[in-house]
Amino acid sequence: MNAKTLDAIKPFLDWIPLIVFFYIYKTTEGEGSEHIIAATTGLLIATLIVYGLMFVLQKFTLEKRQWLVVVLTVVFGGLTMAFQDDFYIRLKAPIINAVFAFGLAMSPLFLGGTPGIQKMLGPIFEMTPKQWMKLNWVWVGFFTLMAVLQALFAFVWVEYWAMFTAFGDMIVMVVFMVAQFWFLRGFMRKDIK
């Protein structure tokens, strides 16, 4: 599989474990948190399969973001299963989004003044340093919002948590991405247009 094809399907592969989780969550009957424990087992297995496949397809490497997802899924999924308590798996998504927000916020300090978003999108868009910094803060805000939403659904609106985790955050992300690329279309590098 060539790199362009792999880059195109990566976002879809990322959702497979969540879809497996949601399916098992909705189709398993049980008392208390039994359905969440079963869904967490499915999530762990699907995560290891999907990211194992990505590891092979990406020439035996994973991106930092992918490692973060795998490690946090294994840690929080493992704690959920070990203690038979869904509290731990509900922590995963808010923590992942908070780490992304924090990482982008701190990126100029560790990348010689270059915002992390510029490192990721620089090959596609041409902007001034000030514009890159603003865009970086927009993404920090987005990941902060996602962390807050995930925490609210995980601990306040618990009955909707699985639905939001599987589909709601995907909808928020797609709307954000469409808005971003609509705004950024004027900054696309001329050699890409």
UniProtKB/Swiss-Prot annotation:
The membrane spanning regions, by residue number, are 5-25, 36-56, 67-87, 93-113, 138-158, 164-184
Q: Provide the coiled-coil residue spans.
A: none
Q: What is its main location?
A: membrane
Question: InterPro entries annotated for this entry?
Answer: YciB
Q: How does it sit in the membrane?
A: Multi-pass membrane protein
Signal sequence span per UniProt?
Answer: none
Subcellular localization is given as: Cell inner membrane
Q: Give the record's GO CC terms.
A: plasma membrane
Keyword terms, alphabetized: Cell inner membrane, Cell membrane, Membrane, Transmembrane, Transmembrane helix
What Pfam families does the entry give? IspA (PF04279)
Q: What exactly does this protein do?
A: Plays a role in cell envelope biogenesis, maintenance of cell envelope integrity and membrane homeostasis.
Which PANTHER family is this protein grouped with?
A: INNER MEMBRANE-SPANNING PROTEIN YCIB, INTRACELLULAR SEPTATION PROTEIN A-RELATED
Q: What is this protein called?
A: Inner membrane-spanning protein YciB
